[in-house]
Amino acid sequence: GYLECNKGFITLGKDMGKIVKVPVFVFLIRHLEGNVLIDTGISSRFKETWGKRLNYFIPILKHNIVEYLKDIKINYIINTHLHIDHCENNPFFKDSEIIVQRKEYEIACNPKPYQRLSYPDRVDKNLNYRLINTNLDLFGDETIKIIKTPGHTEGHQSVLLNLTGKKIFIAGDSCYTSENLKNNILPGIIWNADKVMECYEMIRNLKDTLVIFGHEEAKI
């Protein structure tokens, strides 16, 4: 799907007031050890669930992910973080193991007042969460590696894929767009500016890797 929003939320201090449409991604990875979903995106119920967020962000649902994947068993979900546009469909995958950084889960369950706009109103604690505190090679074969990338949020993580010899870095919101990266522009929603810059530098140092930015159109 997409979000319509003020570009100032994407590029802090630049193009404030300009309305843009940015993509919201969900990735399905098929692996011999099981199907993996990276983020779960916006729910078809957003008109009821987003509340005052709709004053700032207008979701445009291209696909109902739950309906689209209804005949596919999802073994694992990797949430880059738990902001509402990345995890709202989590409750529909009750049989999946959801992998998230422990710090991110703890903050999402009890966000500070200034964080509440970004996180869901309620985290379903009955889901099958696997809380981690470090990087993780999901299947031990280096095909799907979870990498801690705090900055946008304290518990943010990204995913490095190495499939059929092609490396792809799913940045999530560690870096919104190539414009942010090129010009060292902070995102409009941020936990720690220094950590964001560390993420940018790490991304620049990736070799022979396609980077999929969190909110920029991409071709794989």
Feature roles, as predicted:
Residues 2-4, 34, 42-45, 84-85, ...:
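Short, solvent-exposed loop/turn segments at secondary-structure junctions
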Residues 36, 78, 99, 130-132, ...:
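Hydrophobic/aromatic beta-strand patches that form the interior of the parallel beta-sheet core
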Residues 43-44, 58-85, 97, 101-150, 191-208, ...:
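Metallo-beta-lactamase
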Residues 91-94:
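Short, conserved loop/helix-junction motifs that constitute active-site signature segments
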Residues 21-23, 132, 153-155:
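Residues that act as N-cap/strand-start positions at coil-to-secondary-structure junctions
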Residues 2-67, 158-172:
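Conserved beta-strand hairpin/beta-sheet module of binuclear metal-dependent hydrolase folds
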